[in-house]
Amino acid sequence: MRNIFKRNQEPNVAPATTTATMPLAPVAPADNSTESTGPGESQEDMFAKLKEKFFNEINKIPLPPWALIAMAVVAGLLLLTCCFCICKKCCCKKKKNKKEKGKGMKNAMNMKDMKGGQDDDDAETGLTEGEGEGEEEKEPENLGKLQFSLDYDFQANQLTVGVLQAAELPALDMGGTSDPYVKVFLLPDKKKKYETKVHRKTLNPAFNETFTFKVPYQELAGKTLVMAIYDFDRFSKHDIIGEVKVPMNTVDLGQPIEEWRDLQGGEKEEPEKLGDICTSLRYVPTAGKLTVCILEAKNLKKMDVGGLSDPYVKIHLMQNGKRLKKKKTTVKKKTLNPYFNESFSFEIPFEQIQKVQVVVTVLDYDKLGKNEAIGKIFVGSNATGTELRHWSDMLANPRRPIAQWHSLKPEEEVDALLGKNK
């Protein structure tokens, strides 16, 4: 047993080996004093090396020291300026956001207060929002006043209207005045319309003009007298200042009447459709001959009681506002779409062709009274729109007839343009 135990223990004993032993240097004990080479000392060495290298590189640059210092100062200033701008922008943005936020809260509070106050007011008055708006009254605009007179002759069945004077009219012109005149007519019939003379540059015109309407007394009650004051403008549409309406069934015509009435706002007159006319122009320069052919008209204004007209056409050759020659067509009875096809010739030398105008007027023939103008146009070198284009086409195509439709214009408008072109 003892032998077995010894045999089992033998492998645990390491065999003796011969190894070369190296002499070891004595190891100094660890010391935490400042004399040891730590990381702080290595960083200082690196910084010193970098500093030395940096100055060596600078010394290689072929510039004087003062130039290098100046460049460094400028670079520093630029850097500081950029930093300042960035900081300022950030601060302003924060301030703006804060201000808008505060303003939004304030507006919300104000709206809430206003709504609450409005609700309280509505509760006190018992009015809803729509009813409150309806109660607001606009102050009437002061348009001035008109003095007029009325006198009815029962034996002659004739109403005499006197337009006496106006006062305190508003200024519609640039100079602080107006050029007023009065239109007088009886509704619902606008065919018979009178006008006073134009009074220049005044707000208190004295008209003192009378006009007569032949109306049976039985029919007078269904009519309304209208006296509308306009501001005359030579080169554009006349502006209405105001009007006085007198329903005749509210007036006692047993004795003459004279009174003042305030002007009320008048409705602007829509441009009246007067109809269209087709004309043909032909000019032969070598012969100095102008041929005007009146072909037809359509959709003319109704001038007669029966809803028709008796139209005919007048042609005037004019130069510098003077009538040189006059021609006219035959009368076409009871029609608003007459067909004429009538030609008229005028002798005009080539050197004068650009100095003349051809005025075409459509009139309604009246056997008993005055023939009334339905509408008017003129063609020539100083015309405008389709009239000027028609004249230019005629001159560009000598010896060739050029036909063109034209819309009729009010007589006074065309006369004003002709007067401007004198």
Swiss-Prot record:
UniProt feature, compositional bias: Acidic residues: 119-139
Region (Disordered): 1-43, 102-141
Compartments it resides in: Cytoplasmic vesicle, Secretory vesicle, Synaptic vesicle membrane; Cytoplasmic vesicle, Secretory vesicle, Chromaffin granule membrane; Cytoplasm
A GO molecular function held by the record: phosphatidylserine binding
Ligand binding (Ca(2+) 1): 173, 179, 231-233
Residues holding Ca(2+) 2: 172-173, 231, 233, 239
Keyword terms: Calcium, Cytoplasm, Cytoplasmic vesicle, Differentiation, Glycoprotein, Membrane, Metal-binding, Phosphoprotein, Repeat, Synapse, Transmembrane, Transmembrane helix
Database matches in Pfam families: C2
InterPro entries: C2_dom, C2_domain_sf, Synaptotagmin
Low complexity bias locations: 14-30
Keyword Transmembrane helix: yes
Glycosylation sites: 32
Residues at which Ca(2+) 3 binds: 233, 236-237, 239
Cytoplasmic side: 88-422
One GO term describing the cellular component: synaptic vesicle membrane
Sites where the protein binds Ca(2+) 4: 304, 310, 364, 366
Transmembrane segments: 61-87
Sites of Phosphotyrosine modification: 230
Phosphothreonine sites (modified residues): 125, 128, 202, 386
Annotated spans, Phospholipid binding: 136-382
Membrane topology: Single-pass membrane protein
Annotated family: Belongs to the synaptotagmin family.
Assembly notes: Homotetramer. Heterodimer; heterodimerizes with SYT1 in presence of calcium. Interacts with SCAMP5. Interacts with STON2. Interacts with PRRT2. (Microbial infection) Interacts with C.botulinum neurotoxin type B (BoNT/B, botB).
Protein name per UniProt: Synaptotagmin-2
Source organism of the structure: Mus musculus
The organism's taxonomic lineage, starting at the top: Eukaryota, Metazoa, Chordata, Craniata, Vertebrata
Originating gene: Syt2
